[in-house]
Every structure is written in structure tokens, then in C-alpha cells.
A protein has these predicted regions:
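Residue-level marker of intrinsically disordered, low-complexity segments enriched
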Residues: 28, 126-129
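Histidine-acidic residue clusters that define the catalytic metal-binding segment
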Residues: 2-20, 153-193
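M16 family metallopeptidases and their MPP-like homologs
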Residues: 35-62, 66-118, 130-138, 143-171, ...
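His/Glu-based metal-binding/catalytic segments typifying zinc-dependent metallopeptidases
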Residues: 1-2, 7-12, 17-54
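Peptidyl-prolyl cis-trans isomerase
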Residues: 120-126, 174-175
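Short beta-strand/turn micro-motifs at beta-sheet edges
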Residues: 27-30, 83-87, 181-184
């Protein structure tokens, strides 16, 4: 039998995607017609180039609980909702994502926002993270490919790039829980875009 050639279908942004404002924020919405899984992304035009401690702050937050939930209870609750979340900062943008069953997304977002705004600091966890990061940096200096990658970044982006996107060891040692959590809370107040699929 002969297979008929497939005709290309071009995206019609007016028909295939809805754009609207919600509480002053741009929202791009595409309905998932395949299954009940939804993805909600908050995209910020701010990354590690403008705030080098973002990823450390996100990493720290992932170990914390709130006054009403421990980190383990948050993980269990998200599991029960069939949802997950991630916080990632790239060099020029940051993405806070919540994925899972569409019907449970509002509850999952509540949990994530509660964690962001009400995280209970834990100095032991912070000190362990700092120690791990300092050890990782020491190990990277002994690794040839890490040194080569740093050299490539230096050549491509210039000498200021590394100092702009990386905090020095002394600054790392002096970071406080309040600074890290404040960085995330301040990010939440920045203008951002919402992608919902």
C-alpha cells in the first residue's frame, strides 16, 4: 500500500493558543487535549547573571518545611496529588514549574506557594549545603574537564562573567538563611509570565 504524504500543519497562534492577562500577568494557555496532565510554569526574566545565589536558594528551599508541614510531608502530599514541582535558574531566566493532574494543580500550587513564603530556616541544612558546595569547588579545581569548561566560559564571555555569576567562597560562607529565602520571595514579586498547558 502507498502511504499518502503528510501535509504540514502550521501553528495558528490565534486559534491554537490563548493569550490573556490575569492579575496583570501575561498568561499563555494551551489546552491539553491528550490527557489530564497539566504544566504550569512561572517564567521570570531574571537568572544567575543578575542573582548568582538563586540556584543555591532553590536547593536550600527543597530541604525545608513550613510551620505546618515538614519537607517529608510536602513530598508525601505532592505524591498523593500526583504532582511535582521544580525551581531552576538559568543564566538569564528562572522557571518555577508545577506539573501533575490538572484537577490537583490548584492544591499543588498552594503547597508550593506556602513553602516559598513560609519556609522555616534550618541552619544545620544551610551549613551542610555550604560545606558541600565548597568541597565541590575544591574538587572541580582538580578536574581537568571542569577547568577546561571554566576556561571556555572565560574565553566566550570574558573575565567578568564568572565573577558576576558565581559568589566567592567568603560570600558563600557568610550567606544567611534569611538572605536565601528573601531572594526567592523577592523573585516572586518580580514581573513574570505564566505558561499553562
Amino acid at each position: 500500500s502507498v502511504v499518502e504524504p503528510i501535509e504540514p500543519v502550521f501553528v495558528d497562534y490565534e486559534k491554537d493558543m490563548k493569550q490573556f492577562k490575569a492579575e496583570g500577568l501575561n498568561v499563555l494557555y494551551v489546552q491539553n487535549k491528550v490527557n489530564d496532565i497539566a504544566k504550569l510554569n512561572y517564567i521570570y526574566d531574571k537568572g544567575t547573571e543578575s542573582d548568582p545565589i538563586l540556584n543555591l536558594a532553590f536547593n536550600y528551599l527543597s530541604y525545608l518545611g513550613t510551620p505546618t508541614r515538614t519537607a517529608e510531608e510536602i513530598a508525601e502530599e505532592m505524591y498523593q496529588l500526583a504532582c511535582s514541582f521544580s525551581l531552576r535558574a538559568g543564566s538569564s531566566s528562572t522557571n518555577i514549574a508545577v506539573n501533575g493532574l490538572d484537577e490537583n494543580l490548584p492544591k499543588a500550587m498552594e503547597i508550593v506557594e506556602d513553602l516559598i513564603y513560609n519556609a522555616v530556616p534550618d541552619e544545620t541544612i544551610l551549613e551542610n549545603l555550604k560545606t558541600d558546595m565548597l568541597k565541590s569547588r575544591t574538587d572541580a579545581k582538580l578536574n581537568q574537564s571542569s577547568c577546561f569548561n571554566a576556561l571556555q566560559r572565560y574565553v566566550m564571555y570574558g573575565p567578568d562573567f564568572i565573577t558576576k555569576t558565581t559568589i566567592c567562597n567568603e560570600e558563600l560562607k557568610n550567606l544567611t538563611s534569611e538572605e536565601l529565602l528573601g531572594t526567592i520571595r523577592n523573585l516572586m514579586e518580580c514581573e513574570h509570565e505564566i505558561l499553562y498547558y
